[in-house]
């Protein structure tokens, strides 16, 4: 079971995570298209994702996740960002989140060691469960983002004169 406290900590730290992710997206050699996205827009999208992570991670196949990431895909298509860069943006988000959890001791803080033989196994199980759910969430997000991108691409192609 994922600790609600751990998700809460991620959401609380969304501001600093947002800055790190937005900086990486706008400077990473694999995502040059994101340099054309206004910094405020990029930061707002990343912040909303991290801030709502707790709601979304429990049900990654929800309509809200589909709506958010489909819109993100459509918008990025409209901005002319290649799909490969958008896919890599999701990878960057996931990497930053996992690194932040690890580097800032959020797991230890959320699962304090008390006493008894069962603390460590529960600690490891919770970490593994969180890691699995983060992966599942980003897999679904990537799917919906790609669907939104493709839908916008199809609309764009259909509206062009032949």
List each model region and its residues.
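Long, amphipathic alpha-helical coupling/dimerization segments that relay conformational signals between
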Residues: 65-162
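N-terminal low-complexity or simple alpha-helical regulatory segments
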Residues: 2-84
């Amino acid at each position: 079971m994922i600790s609600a406290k751990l998700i809460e900590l991620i959401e609380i730290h969304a501001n600093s995570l947002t800055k790190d992710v937005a900086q990486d997206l706008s400077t990473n050699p694999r995502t040059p298209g994101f340099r054309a996205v206004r910094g405020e827009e990029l930061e707002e999208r990343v912040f909303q994702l991290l801030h709502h992570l707790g709601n979304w991670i429990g049900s990654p196949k929800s309509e809200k996740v589909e709506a958010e990431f489909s819109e993100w895909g459509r918008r990025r298509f409209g901005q002319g960002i290649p799909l490969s860069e958008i896919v890599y943006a999701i990878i960057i988000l996931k990497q930053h989140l996992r690194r932040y959890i690890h580097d800032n001791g959020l797991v230890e803080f959320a699962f304090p060691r008390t006493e008894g033989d069962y603390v460590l196994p529960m600690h490891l199980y919770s970490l593994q469960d969180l890691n699995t759910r983060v992966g599942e969430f980003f897999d679904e997000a990537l799917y919906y983002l790609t669907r939104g991108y493709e839908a916008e691409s199809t609309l764009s192609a259909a509206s062009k004169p032949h």
